[in-house]
């Protein structure tokens, strides 16, 4: 239990079918938090941060043994059902009991007696989460007791350190040697902790480490990554001095620019750091700071290791209006000639693909659309070419070679490249044929993307009027939910009026077949669509807290609570009226959004989890 624990058990009443969820929680040995108020709030709002909960009862008290208790009963609008929870906490050890009841009747004897008599045993000793654990951690790490040392190594990432711990952290980093099992991983984890200590002495020590580790390039990456995680001008200046004179050789794809914020929007929203050893992606976290050291970064365009990452970083700055053409004009010629070469490669690849497709069609060996979503024919775009376009576009007025090059990209047979180039021109108010908007509006796989992109750019009036209707946009938005395995057929069935969370509109129903030879149709839905034919969707960005036991950056996510657009596995029956089946499906998807016991409990095990949609 030294590493922390969370356990669940469901107590069943076989006679009444009632269930009570019993949970146990123990803080890890090195857990530390400064915010006791936030801790209390977590226990008082266990069922999430959703403001639509109706609190029927709330009580906080302290038992004679100094164990804190919280009791909470909440309900939802339009429902007589309620959740009843009671929590207990003392020195890093917590218990909770939770159940579902009905406000129309009194709790049963089973439920009432359990809640009234449940008292956790206080024999299990925990740790005070409000006391710093750094001294305990360092003592364990340097201990001759292998059990204590291994425990500390295992939980390096859990320990919370600040500037007062810098001296001890330096001691353990320098104390380590190759006799340590998993030496590189352990030392890397310790160096990563320096990224949490955002002081000048810490930055100076990271610089010292960088040069001392010149024979272990992987650890040099960690030193640079931690340095950039400080997000201070001093640290960035130290990084500039290093990268300008002694840039490390990049191996093992370390130079591949992988912005983790793209893959994990939760991390981006939280502002949390992310240790992956790829220090270059840290530069995009604070573009304004990166702009101050840009002159030292641009020469790296001449190094193959760094070229791609620096180009993408420069592209982000161009998009953010942080750089002007004059800031990198000395590299214009290099970018232009490389872009022309890339365009030639794109043209050759497109011709080759067209020939291969013709041969496949001739031999009737086309890949199954169900399995691969037309992977044999699907356009993939050209990220490199799009990036060159972004970097060269600022020279549109001053250099006559830019416009013809980008116009050639618009003529590409690759629809992804064509679409991205069109959006780039649209974003920067550059001319392009209006026929392109009609072309992409006519395509099911692009129509909804075009609609949302134009809306985001605040030029919705340029969306083709011919396709600005619920049915065409509905089919396209539905298909956008399929990243692969495109259905063979999607056919509109009917629509039903409904109301959800104060918004009234339609749920559109479609039937689809995954494969042409499927015997039955399945149902899909699109909505909630406003009644106004000129509007297609309600905007919303609800933030949902997952659980009080989850820590940032994974404690919440954002979604549109008015979106019911999805493919279902519900089959359309031939022996039942279609409208009745649609009404039944509508009730099901609306009920699925309720905070119901069906989602709160996992019937097949002793585990429990909150609903995926608790709004």
Which residue stretches match the model-derived regions?
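Amphipathic alpha-helical scaffolding segments comprising HEAT/armadillo-like alpha-solenoid repeats
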Residues: 129-139, 162-178, 199-211, 233-246, ...
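Intrinsically disordered terminal tails
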Residues: 377-402, 407-615
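Short, well-ordered beta-strand elements
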Residues: 19-24, 92-102
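Coil residues (strongly favoring Ser/Thr
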Residues: 15, 35-36, 50-51, 77, ...
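Structural detector for internal amphipathic alpha-helices that build alpha-solenoid repeat scaffolds
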Residues: 150-162, 184-199, 218-232, 251-287, ...
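Acidic, Ser/Thr-rich low-complexity intrinsically disordered segments
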Residues: 135-168, 612-615
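Surface-exposed amphipathic alpha-helical segments
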Residues: 1, 47-48, 97-138, 575-606, ...
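Signature of long, low-cysteine stretches enriched in small and polar/charged residues
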Residues: 1-89, 191-193, 204, 222, ...
């Amino acid at each position: 239990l030294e590493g922390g624990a969370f356990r669940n058990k469901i107590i069943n009443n076989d006679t009444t079918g009632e269930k009570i969820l019993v949970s146990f929680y123990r803080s890890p040995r090195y857990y530390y938090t400064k915010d006791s108020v936030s801790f209390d709030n977590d226990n008082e709002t266990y069922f999430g941060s959703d403001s639509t909960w109706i609190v029927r009862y709330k009580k906080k008290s302290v038992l004679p043994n100094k164990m804190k208790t919280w009791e909470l009963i909440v309900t939802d609008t339009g429902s007589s059902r309620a959740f009843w929870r009671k929590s207990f906490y003392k020195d890093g050890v917590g218990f909770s009991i939770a159940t579902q009841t009905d406000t129309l009747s009194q709790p049963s004897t089973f439920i009432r007696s359990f809640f009234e008599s449940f008292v956790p045993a206080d024999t299990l000793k925990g740790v005070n989460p409000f006391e710093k654990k750094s001294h305990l951690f360092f003592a364990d790490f340097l201990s001759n007791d292998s059990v204590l040392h291994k425990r500390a190594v295992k939980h390096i990432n859990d320990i919370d350190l600040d500037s007062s711990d810098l001296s001890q952290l330096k001691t353990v980093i320098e104390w380590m040697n190759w006799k340590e099992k998993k030496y590189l991983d352990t030392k890397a984890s310790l160096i990563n902790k320096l990224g949490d200590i955002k002081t000048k002495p810490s930055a100076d020590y990271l610089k010292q480490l960088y040069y001392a580790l010149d024979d272990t390039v992987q650890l040099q990456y960690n030193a640079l990554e931690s340095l950039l995680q400080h997000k201070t001008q001093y640290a960035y200046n130290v990084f500039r001095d290093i990268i300008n004179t002694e840039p490390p050789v990049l191996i093992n794809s370390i130079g591949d620019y992988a912005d983790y914020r793209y893959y994990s929007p939760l991390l981006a929203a939280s502002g949390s750091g992310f240790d992956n050893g790829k220090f270059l992606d840290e530069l995009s976290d604070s573009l304004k700071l990166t702009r101050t050291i840009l002159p030292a970064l641009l020469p790296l365009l001449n190094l193959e290791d760094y070229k791609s990452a620096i180009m993408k970083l420069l592209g982000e700055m161009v998009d953010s209006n942080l750089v002007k053409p004059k800031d990198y004009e000395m590299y214009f010629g290099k970018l232009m000639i490389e872009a022309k070469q890339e365009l030639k490669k794109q043209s050759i690849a497109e011709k080759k693909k067209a020939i291969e497709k013709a041969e496949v069609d001739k031999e009737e060996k086309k890949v199954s659309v169900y399995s691969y979503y037309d992977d044999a024919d699907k356009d993939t775009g050209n990220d490199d070419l799009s990036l060159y376009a972004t970097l060269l576009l600022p020279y549109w007025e001053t250099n006559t070679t830019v416009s013809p090059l980008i116009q050639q990209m618009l003529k590409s047979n690759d629809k992804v490249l064509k679409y991205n180039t069109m959006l780039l021109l649209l974003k920067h108010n550059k001319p392009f044929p209006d026929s392109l908007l009609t072309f992409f509006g006519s395509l099911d796989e692009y129509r909804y993307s075009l609609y949302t992109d134009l809306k985001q750019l605040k030029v919705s009036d340029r969306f083709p009027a011919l396709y600005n209707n619920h049915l065409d946009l509905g089919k396209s938005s539905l298909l956008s939910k399929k990243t692969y395995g495109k259905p063979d057929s999607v056919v509109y069935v009917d629509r039903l009026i409904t109301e959800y969370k104060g918004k009234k509109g339609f749920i559109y129903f479609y039937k689809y077949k995954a494969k042409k030879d499927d015997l039955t149709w399945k149902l899909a839905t699109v909505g909630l669509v406003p009644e106004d034919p000129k509007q297609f969707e309600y905007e919303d960005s609800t933030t949902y807290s997952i659980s009080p036991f989850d820590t940032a950056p994974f404690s919440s996510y954002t979604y549109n609570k008015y979106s019911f657009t999805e493919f279902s596995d519900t089959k359309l029956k031939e022996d039942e009226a279609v409208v009745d089946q649609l009404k039944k499906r509508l009730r099901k998807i609306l009920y699925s959004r309720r905070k119901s016991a069906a989602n709160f409990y996992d019937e097949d095990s002793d585990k429990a989890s909150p609903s995926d949609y608790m709004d």
